[in-house]
Every structure is written in structure tokens, then in C-alpha cells.
């Protein structure tokens, strides 16, 4: 038997489990290790200002100051999601019939980039090898992903080589720094994308920081104003409540937690090796790719006639249901990576010990084996 993963129903099931956990045991019972938990730390005084015009008037200057400190550049543009910023950027800067070229450490790119390229009638090419990377005369935008969805980081040298090639062709460079604005800088001590020479940088205010799901874009005043026009035309701007949450997240952000997780990850990794598991390390924890989860389940005796993305999602769903541990495959947006990633920098990691996490990881593999043997996939994923 084989099934195709229904992304909408899968996410609805994951969120229902979370809702039931909150109603039964409270929100503090959840252990969100996605690195995307975010936060919305606003005060009664903030709430009194959350009106259509009063809010932007009061908070604009503050988000500009904090955003520039975090990302660099001359001007900041808050948007309702990083994806929104990418969409607006491409609509504003890319003409039909031209090309977007993209360099990243490992494919695939965030789907919003190729999808919007198609939307505006532009060609799109991805490169992971700098020796093959090329910018022809028809290129209107160069993208760089600073840190991939699985937290793989490109070097400063590669950054500079791509930017140099783009500048030689007089092509605008945009950096998708969704989590990279924290990982690259806190762990690898890299400069901001703007300081490296990029024209635009966009980051997610919920990734490895305690802000709400939203996006912050930085760049020159001229370029940001051009993109801002599109953002306002399409209703992609961050409203006052979101901007306040972003400000609080930026104020609370400190690289120390990320740096501490980076130091501890090797101890955590060794505990997993001691259990005969072989995850991949990330800068702030560890992860199992979907194929690795399938292989581990098969190693434990299950005969798996099912695609790896389904197995990984089952594993993620069982983690929530049995251990209250949230990972991306069960609850991420449609199209999100099915890598099961455990972020030890997440604030909820304080709720359990390393040994408790390792025990949950191992037991969930056994539970996934039972699902495979009993052919309970649809029940776990959707019912």
C-alpha cells in the first residue's frame, strides 16, 4: 500500500493534537523544538495603541532602529511573512522574460522563490556549485540563501564571490536570511548580508528568536521604497500588532542561547550515537532526514512500502501525541521540509533533559514501526 501525503489534512491533524493538549494540560505542557515557536510578548499599554494609524505612527521609528541594528541597511520594511517579502520583492524587481539565479548550500530553495518567478513570467535557476554558477545578461535578480531550511550555512567567501559576480553585471542581490540572520551571525560570526554587499536581506522574526511569525526586510531606502509600494498594493504589510511583537522579539534577542546550544549539541549527538542512532548535527541540535527515518524504521524490523515523507510525518505526529514534542513535519505549512529537526536552542528545551529527549526519540521510532506493521498510516496522519 502507498499513499500520497495530504498536506492540508496532515497539518489540521497536527494542530488538533496541539489544541487537545492545551485544553487538557495547558500550553506549558507543549515542548516546541522546531526553532519556530516565536512569541508575542505585548503589554496592555501596547494593546491600547494597536489601531490602524496610531500603531504605525508610534512603532515605526522603533522597528526601524532595532531592525537596522539586527540586519543592517538604511531602511526596514516589516511584512506579514518572509514569504510575503520575497513575493513583493520579485514582483517589484523582476520583469517578465528575465531570469532569477539562486545560490544556496543545498537544494531545494524555499518554494516561494521559484513560485513567484513563475508568477511574474521569469526563468529560474538554482546552483549549489560555485564553479557552475553563472549570471547572464538577462538576469534581473540574484538570490542567496544564507542558511537552508535544514540549517546548512554558506561561507563568507562564497557569499562574497556570488555578490562580486552580481555587481560586475550590475544585478541586484537579495538574501533569504530567514534563520541565517541568527545562525550565521551567532554561531559562525559572519557579518550581516548587507555588510557583505547584498542589496536586500529578509529574515523571519519567529526563527530562533522570540518574535511572531513575520518578516523583516532591510536594504537601501530606494530599493525598500520600491518594494514597499508593492507590499501595500497587495496587502502584504505587517499590521501594528505584528510590528509590536517584532519589536519585542528584537529587544529580547540575544545570541547567547544559540551559542550555548551550539556548544551542547555534541554531547546530545553522542547520547544518540550511544543508542545506535545516526542523526545529522545542526548548528543548534540534530535532525533526521526523511530517508534516514525510513531507514531506521526498516532497521527495526518494519517492512515499509511507503514514501519517506509519509514515514517522517507519522514519526513527527507520534512525537506530539505521545511526548508533546512539536517538530515541523506534522505542523509545518504545506510544502515544508519533512526533515525532523530538534532545535536545542528553542526555549522549550528547558522543559526536558537530554536523556528525556533521547528516550522520546528512540521510543517514537518503535511506535512508528508499530504503525507500519499495522498499516495505521491514515489513522495517525488524518483521523
Curated annotation (Swiss-Prot):
Q: Which residues carry this modification: N6-(pyridoxal phosphate)lysine?
A: 207
- Write out the entry's keywords from A to Z: Pyridoxal phosphate
State whether keyword Protein transport applies: no
The record's family statement is: Belongs to the UPF0425 family.
This protein's cofactor list reads: pyridoxal 5'-phosphate
State the name under which the record lists this protein: UPF0425 pyridoxal phosphate-dependent protein Msp_0916
Do you know which InterPro entries this protein is assigned to? Cys/Met-Metab_PyrdxlP-dep_enz (IPR000277), PyrdxlP-dep_transferase_arc (IPR020033), PyrdxlP-dep_Trfase (IPR015424), PyrdxlP-dep_Trfase_major (IPR015421), UPF0425_MJ0158-like_C (IPR055177)
Pfam families from the xrefs?
Cys_Met_Meta_PP, UPF0425_C
Kindly list the biological process annotations in GO that this record carries.
transsulfuration
Question: Which GO molecular function annotation, any one, does this entry have?
Answer: pyridoxal phosphate binding
Amino acid at each position: 500500500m502507498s499513499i500520497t501525503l495530504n498536506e492540508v489534512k496532515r497539518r489540521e491533524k497536527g494542530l488538533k493534537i496541539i489544541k487537545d493538549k492545551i485544553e487538557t494540560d495547558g500550553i506549558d505542557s507543549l515542548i516546541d523544538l522546531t526553532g519556530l515557536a516565536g512569541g508575542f510578548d505585548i503589554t496592555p499599554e501596547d494593546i491600547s495603541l494597536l489601531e490602524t494609524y496610531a500603531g504605525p505612527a508610534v512603532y515605526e521609528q522603533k522597528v526601524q532602529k532595532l531592525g537596522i541594528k539586527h540586519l543592517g541597511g538604511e531602511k526596514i520594511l516589516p511584512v506579514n511573512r518572509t514569504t510575503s517579502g520575497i513575493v513583493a520583492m520579485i514582483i517589484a524587481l523582476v520583469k517578465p522574460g528575465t531570469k532569477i539565479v539562486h545560490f544556496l548550500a543545498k537544494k531545494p530553495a524555499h518554494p516561494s522563490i521559484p513560485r513567484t518567478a513563475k508568477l511574474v513570467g521569469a526563468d529560474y535557476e538554482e546552483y549549489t556549485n560555485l564553479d557552475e554558477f553563472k549570471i547572464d545578461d538577462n538576469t534581473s535578480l540574484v538570490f542567496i540563501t544564507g542558511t537552508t531550511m535544514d540549517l546548512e550555512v554558506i561561507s563568507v567567501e562564497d557569499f562574497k564571490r556570488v555578490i562580486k559576480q552580481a555587481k560586475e553585471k550590475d544585478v541586484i542581490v537579495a538574501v533569504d536570511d530567514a534563520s541565517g540572520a541568527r545562525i550565521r551571525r551567532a554561531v559562525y560570526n559572519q557579518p550581516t548580508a548587507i555588510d557583505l554587499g547584498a542589496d536586500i536581506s529578509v529574515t523571519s522574526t519567529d526563527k530562533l528568536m522570540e518574535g511572531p511569525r513575520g518578516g523583516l526586510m532591510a536594504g537601501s531606502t530606494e530599493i525598500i521604497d520600491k518594494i514597499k509600494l508593492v507590499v501595500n498594493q497587495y496587502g502584504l504589510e505587517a499590521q501594528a500588532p505584528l510590528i509590536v511583537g517584532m519589536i519585542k522579539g528584537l529587544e529580547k534577542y540575544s545570541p547567547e542561547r544559540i551559542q550555548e546550544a551550539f556548544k551542547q549539541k555534541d554531547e546530545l549527538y553522542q547520547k544518540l550515537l550511544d543508542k545506535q542512532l545516526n542523526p545529522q548535527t545542526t548548528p543548534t541540535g540534530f535532525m533526521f532526514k526523511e530517508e534516514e527515518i525510513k531507514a531506521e524504521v526498516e532497521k527495526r524490523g518494519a517492512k515499509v512500502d511507503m514514501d519517506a515523507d509519509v514515514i517522517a510525518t507519522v514519526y513527527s505526529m507520534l512525537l506530539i501525541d505521545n511526548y508533546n514534542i512539536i517538530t515541523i513535519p506534522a505542523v509545518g505549512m504545506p510544502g515544508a521540509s519533512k526533515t525532523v529537526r530538534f532545535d536545542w536552542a528553542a526555549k522549550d528545551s528547558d522543559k526536558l533533559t537530554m536523556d528525556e529527549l533521547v528516550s522520546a526519540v528512540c521510543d517514537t521510532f518503535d511506535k512508528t514501526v508499530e504503525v507500519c506493521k499495522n498499516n495505521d498510516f491514515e489513522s495517525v496522519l488524518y483521523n
